[in-house]
C-alpha cells in the first residue's frame, strides 16, 4: 500500500503536466463544453472547486501516510481555504488574473520540489496553480451579462473561447 502511495506522489506532478500540455488552449469538443459550462454556470465553477478540494485532500492523505512531518501539516493548512467556495473562487481568480502571482507560486512550488520533505507543499501549490489556469477569467464571466452576448450559441462559444484565458 505504501509503495502505491509513493508511486502516486511521484507520478502525480508528471500526470498533471501532461494533462496541462494536452488540454491548455485546445479546442476539443469536450473542452469547448467545459469552457462554456464553467463560464455560464456558477454551479459548474463550484463543482470545479469541489473536485480541486478532493484532489488536494487525497494528496494530503497520501503525504500523511508516507511522510509524517510538519510540511504535511502546512499543506493541510493550505488546503483548508478551499473548503469554502467563495474563498477558493477568489484564490483561483487571483492566480488566473495575476501573472506575477502565478509565476511566484510556481517558483515557490519548484523550490519546495527540490527539498524532499517539502513535497506535500509542492503538490498543493502546483495543483492549485495548474487548476487556476483552467479557471475562467473574470473578464469572460462578466461578459455573459452583456446584452449582445445573448445572441446565438456558436457566436457565444467563440467569444468564450477567445477571452477564456
Regions found by a protein language model. Give the residues of each.
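Alpha-helical transmembrane segments and immediately adjacent membrane-interfacial amphipathic helices
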Residues: 3-26, 43-165
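Membrane-interfacial, low-structure loops and terminal tails that flank and connect transmembrane helices
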Residues: 30-41
Amino acid at each position: 500500500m505504501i509503495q502505491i502511495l509513493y508511486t502516486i506522489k511521484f507520478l502525480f506532478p508528471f500526470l498533471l503536466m501532461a494533462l496541462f500540455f494536452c488540454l491548455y488552449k485546445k479546442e476539443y469538443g469536450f473542452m469547448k463544453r467545459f469552457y462554456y459550462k464553467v463560464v455560464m454556470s456558477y454551479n459548474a465553477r463550484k463543482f470545479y472547486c469541489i473536485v480541486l478540494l478532493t484532489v488536494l485532500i487525497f494528496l494530503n492523505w497520501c503525504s500523511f501516510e508516507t511522510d509524517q512531518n510538519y510540511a504535511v501539516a502546512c499543506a493541510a493548512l493550505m488546503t483548508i481555504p478551499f473548503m469554502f467556495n467563495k474563498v477558493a473562487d477568489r484564490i483561483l481568480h487571483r492566480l488566473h488574473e495575476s501573472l506575477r502571482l502565478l509565476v511566484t507560486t510556481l517558483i515557490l512550488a519548484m523550490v519546495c520540489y527540490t527539498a524532499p520533505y517539502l513535497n506535500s507543499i509542492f503538490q498543493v501549490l502546483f495543483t492549485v496553480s495548474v487548476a487556476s489556469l483552467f479557471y475562467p477569467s473574470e473578464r469572460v464571466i462578466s461578459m455573459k451579462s452583456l446584452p449582445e452576448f445573448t445572441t446565438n450559441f456558436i457566436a457565444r462559444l467563440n467569444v468564450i473561447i477567445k477571452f477564456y484565458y
